[in-house]
């Protein structure tokens, strides 16, 4: 009986075995019913003894384990139901702190501000450059005829005063006469080109063929411009080279015929461009004009994703200035031809006005987008356009000095690739064929119009010179204009009178101190290498911001350069449209 009572006593027997001393199979079954699997037999995990009036530890553990297990199931079920809501709430209330990456976001903001400044700075450069091209273009029609007349008058009246000088004419006067003769010869040669036949020949072609022709003409125009100024410079130097030099050229006459042929072919090329644009204007559905304008946006693809330095961007900016001014002249030619066909009816001008605005607007939009993304991808600031404008202003100011080494129109041609002679020949041909001058009153109007052009040229030159001085002063480049003139070469004998002295830029001046616009360079064979002087404006451009301190090192390295390397550099600068110094 004692054994039975002992087995039935609470806390012992079956319950005791269930609570802690059961077999492993019973423990496993209890664990499946949600009871804890902890083995209370271990001394470390044995529960504390139960107090009076409390259930045994094993019973309490079982009861609590059951309710805790049931509550855990409900909690897990609630978590599984609310997981999507909690994720959405976490996404809606999640925060972050931008100030931890302040430098990155500041740089991005500056890029946005730079892109916003690009249109203003670019158009300021374009505006200044277009007026520079206009000044060089008006020079052909206004001051060049007067200078040619003065040079011819000097040549005719020279025997009356005696031959006091070795030269019959000054180098600048020789160049002016050559320009005038080339202009007149090419003008008469253009009369043999039938504009009407060319118009109908182009109009009969398909749209795709005209699109291809227009692209080829743009490429040919750039090639002609890059090589044409070299032909003209070779002619000017051959005609004014000192006679005591060893003859190393083919002669003035072959160079002259090459220059005439170049100006004539380039004028025909521009005429074909103007004719193609005229056909696009007169097309019924304007599809050709739209395709031609969309061709400008191809420039964005070809330019934006390339590596650009400051010098490359300057060359492209000059090319854009020249291209925009040339397009303005082409639009003027198209309007003149259309107004002539409609008997100068002013109502037809308003028909052409939307197309003209579309061409101009597309050109401006393409330039802005192209320059904005080029500066963004290459980390170029918008202040670089002020440097470009100051460099162009330096060219203008230096050409007005007494020791100027070239004419300003030639300087613009070398810097921007804009050659005004072919464009002037074509405009003269179109104007004279479109406007008939008959009667005394008509000639009076022509004289008044010529006086107006001279007034416009003088006013434009004065304003440009004033603004150029301001830009040069703001860029702190005025000290480069007042370099001391080096002494004569040391390799010449002292007893021989020297009639030529080396000027600041390596060009010559006369003995009496009078200098001309196109003073000729002195032969560099006898002069020491240290007297080689580069152009100040080119040095300003080709020197990046952080390399101004290395100019002295570059000048020391210049002494060790060979003449062959210098010639290669001159050819490279010539192809790129830079100035030849």
Curated annotation (Swiss-Prot):
Source species: Gallus gallus (Chicken)
Transmembrane segments: 125-145, 182-202, 250-270, 417-437, 439-459
Gene: TAPT1
Topology relative to the membrane: Multi-pass membrane protein
Biased composition (Pro residues): 46-55
Top-rank lineage group of the source organism: Eukaryota
Protein name: Transmembrane anterior posterior transformation protein 1 homolog
Subcellular location: Cytoplasm, Cytoskeleton, Microtubule organizing center, Centrosome; Cytoplasm, Cytoskeleton, Cilium basal body; Membrane
Keywords (A to Z) from UniProt: Cell projection, Chondrogenesis, Cilium, Cilium biogenesis/degradation, Cytoplasm, Cytoskeleton, Developmental protein, Differentiation, Membrane, Osteogenesis, Transmembrane, Transmembrane helix
InterPro entries the record matches: Tatp1
Start-end of Gly residues biased regions: 11-23
An example Gene Ontology CC term for this record: membrane
Region feature Disordered, mapped onto this chain: 1-72, 484-563
């Amino acid at each position: 009986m004692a054994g039975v009572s002992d087995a039935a006593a609470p806390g012992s027997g079956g319950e005791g075995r269930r609570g802690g001393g059961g077999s492993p199979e019973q423990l496993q079954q209890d664990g499946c019913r949600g009871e804890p699997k902890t083995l209370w037999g271990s001394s470390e995990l044995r529960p504390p003894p139960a107090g009076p009036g409390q259930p045994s530890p094993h019973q309490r553990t079982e009861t609590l384990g059951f309710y805790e297990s049931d509550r855990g199931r409900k909690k897990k079920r609630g978590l599984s139901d609310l997981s999507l809501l909690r994720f959405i709430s976490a996404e809606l209330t999640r925060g972050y702190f931008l100030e931890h990456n302040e430098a990155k976001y500041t740089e991005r903001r500056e890029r946005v501000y730079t892109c916003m400044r690009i249109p203003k700075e670019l158009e300021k450069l374009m505006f200044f450059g277009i007026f520079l091209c206009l000044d060089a273009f008006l020079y052909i029609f206004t001051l060049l005829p007067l200078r040619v007349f003065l040079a011819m008058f000097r040549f005719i009246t020279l025997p009356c005063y005696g031959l006091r000088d070795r030269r019959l004419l000054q180098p600048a006067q020789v160049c002016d006469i050559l320009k005038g003769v080339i202009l007149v010869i090419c003008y008469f040669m253009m009369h043999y080109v039938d504009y009407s036949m060319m118009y109908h020949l182009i109009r009969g072609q398909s749209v795709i063929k005209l699109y291809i022709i227009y692209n080829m003409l743009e490429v040919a125009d750039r090639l002609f411009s890059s090589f044409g100024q070299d032909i003209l410079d070779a002619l000017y130097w051959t005609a004014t080279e000192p006679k005591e030099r060893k003859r190393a050229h083919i002669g003035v006459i072959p160079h002259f015929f090459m220059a005439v042929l170049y100006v004539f072919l380039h004028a025909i090329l521009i005429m074909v461009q103007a004719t193609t644009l005229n056909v696009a204007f007169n097309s019924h559905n304007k599809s050709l004009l739209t395709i031609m304008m969309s061709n400008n946006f191809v420039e964005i693809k070809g330019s934006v994703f390339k590596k650009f330095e400051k010098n490359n961007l300057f060359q492209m900016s000059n090319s854009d200035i020249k291209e925009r001014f040339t397009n303005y002249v082409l639009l003027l030619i198209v309007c003149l031809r259309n107004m002539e066909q409609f008997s100068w009816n002013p109502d037809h001008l308003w028909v052409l006005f939307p197309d003209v605005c579309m061409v101009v607007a597309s050109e401006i939009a393409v330039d802005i987008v192209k320059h904005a993304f080029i500066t963004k991808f290459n980390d170029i600031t918008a202040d670089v356009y002020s440097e470009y404008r100051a460099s162009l202003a330096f060219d203008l100011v230096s050409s007005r000095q007494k020791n100027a080494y070239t004419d300003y129109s030639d300087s613009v041609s070398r810097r921007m690739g804009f050659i005004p002679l072919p464009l002037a020949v074509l405009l003269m041909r179109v104007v004279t064929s479109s406007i008939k001058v008959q009667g005394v009153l008509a000639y009076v109007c022509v004289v008044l119009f010529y006086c107006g052009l001279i007034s416009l040229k003088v006013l434009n030159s004065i304003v440009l010179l004033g603004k150029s001085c301001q830009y040069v002063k703001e860029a702190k480049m005025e000290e480069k204009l007042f370099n001391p003139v080096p002494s004569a070469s040391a390799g010449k004998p002292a007893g021989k009178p020297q009639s030529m002295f080396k000027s600041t830029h390596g060009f010559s001046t006369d003995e009496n101190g009078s200098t001309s616009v196109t003073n000729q360079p002195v032969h560099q064979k006898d002069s020491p290498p240290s007297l080689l002087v580069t152009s100040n404006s080119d040095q300003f451009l080709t020197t990046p911001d952080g390399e101004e301190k290395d100019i002295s090192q570059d000048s020391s390295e210049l002494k060790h350069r060979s003449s062959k390397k210098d010639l290669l550099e001159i050819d490279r600068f010539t192809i790129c449209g830079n100035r030849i110094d």
